[in-house]
Amino acid sequence: MGIAHTEWESVIGLEVHVELNTESKLFSPARNHFGDEPNTNISPVCTGMPGSLPVLNKDAVRKAVLFGCAVEGDVALFSRFDRKSYFYPDSPRNFQITQYEHPIVRGGCIRAVVEGEEKTFELAQTHLEDDAGMLKHFGDFAGVDYNRAGVPLIEIVSKPCMFSAEDAVAYANALVSILGYIGISDCNMEEGSIRFDVNISVRPRGSRELRNKVEIKNMNSFTFMAQALEAEKRRQIEEYLSHPNEDPKKVVPAATYRWDPEKKKTVLMRLKERAEDYMYFVEPDLPVLQITETYIDEVRQTLPELPHSKYMRYITDFDIAEDLAMILVGDRHTAHFFETATMSCKNYRALSNWITVEFAGRCKAKGKTLPFTGILPEWVAQLVNFIDRGVITGKIAKEIADRMVSSFGESPEDILRRHPSLLPMTDDHALRAIVKEVVAQNTASVADYKNGKAKALGFLVGQIMKRTEGKAPPKRVNELLLAAMRDM
């Protein structure tokens, strides 16, 4: 990016549509379930049949209130539904029921760590609305599946408070974590149960103005989100630099774009509609939604410990690295796995590394995540304890981890019992002979160590471990090696 580009900054906000995991739809008794045969989970309300009337799903309201409490938002005692009018084949009523003027939650915040810095991102509002159906294309014709029509959504709208792609991705990750912890959505991007629309504008660095924003629709991966934001930032800056004397509103008009991952560029879909184009008006078939402070307090009491609080506790109580703590708390199942393991192992730093690095990598290669493999937390704790007590070496521990992931049903103790060849070298006489031989064959490295070059010791240890196939106890190797060099 050229010098001229560095004099500009992004201003980013996100609109996130989250499908709530209720049993039925927002305004009808039809089943809310992904993957069923087309048009099997429908009712007259879903398909806009004349005379059908909406009835609000109580569980969807509770889940929206729970989210509002989780993000410390202001849950409204009175909220209202509105009709958003537009014509599209996947919307059989020709309108969506949403909350335009009086949302169920205002404000709130999402806390995230961005490149080591803790940031707080403010929310504008969260509102309830129903989803549209899906168009499915089959060569020379298209079909409409109304199974998704009427599925309950919360739309979470942030303020324009992010200034980089890194901010946006960190915010999105933190939001997904919160939704997972409170259990109101499965957040499956591939199935569309969470969809990210990003709004971005650019301005000269140091300016406070908000220029026309461009919306990039339906980001279905965090990688694409980051790429799209960077590409759109460059596009807008280049437009402004190419037309310095023109009205900024005409240079970059408000519009909706999509991301083309193959061309690595944003592609125009349409110019932005105005609010009046949707002809919002109060939904006549639904009363005002009224809830009480007592109800809100009861819902708030069901909140679990949330990711940010858990993150701070892990750093303080367990003294583990911030980056590993972030990985652990990112998923509630992984966090639970770690905390269960800490009941059997007090080497928290090593434990966090084995869970987030060693086992996570091995499980990913198998297409699984550690908490859902059958490997018990106590087994990972046992593996770390074996290393700490000198029962096995680090190299042997990795071999055992390989076998644990291959079988998903054996503890380290079971594996050692079945494969005694994995046990470390216990013949001290043989180990002394190997140490003596390595020292004799590497006199230059011995001299380097005696002259203050600490790396030489690591080289000598490596030679010994190589000859013992990693089975020599590291502590004993160091003792014998230092003694042998003193005797020279």
From Swiss-Prot:
InterPro entries: Asn/Gln-tRNA_amidoTrfase_suB/E, Asn/Gln-tRNA_Trfase_suB/E_cat, Asn/Gln_amidotransferase, Asn/Gln_tRNA_amidoTrase-B-like, GatB, GatB_C_1, GatB_Yqey_C_2, Gln-tRNA_amidoTrfase_suB_CS
Reaction catalyzed: L-glutamyl-tRNA(Gln) + L-glutamine + ATP + H2O = L-glutaminyl-tRNA(Gln) + L-glutamate + ADP + phosphate + H(+); L-aspartyl-tRNA(Asn) + L-glutamine + ATP + H2O = L-asparaginyl-tRNA(Asn) + L-glutamate + ADP + phosphate + 2 H(+)
Subunit comment: Heterotrimer of A, B and C subunits.
Protein role: Allows the formation of correctly charged Asn-tRNA(Asn) or Gln-tRNA(Gln) through the transamidation of misacylated Asp-tRNA(Asn) or Glu-tRNA(Gln) in organisms which lack either or both of asparaginyl-tRNA or glutaminyl-tRNA synthetases. The reaction takes place in the presence of glutamine and ATP through an activated phospho-Asp-tRNA(Asn) or phospho-Glu-tRNA(Gln).
Secretion signal, residue range per the UniProt entry: none
Pfam family, one: GatB_Yqey
Protein name: Aspartyl/glutamyl-tRNA(Asn/Gln) amidotransferase subunit B
Gene Ontology MF terms: asparaginyl-tRNA synthase (glutamine-hydrolyzing) activity; ATP binding; glutaminyl-tRNA synthase (glutamine-hydrolyzing) activity
Enzyme class per UniProt: ligase
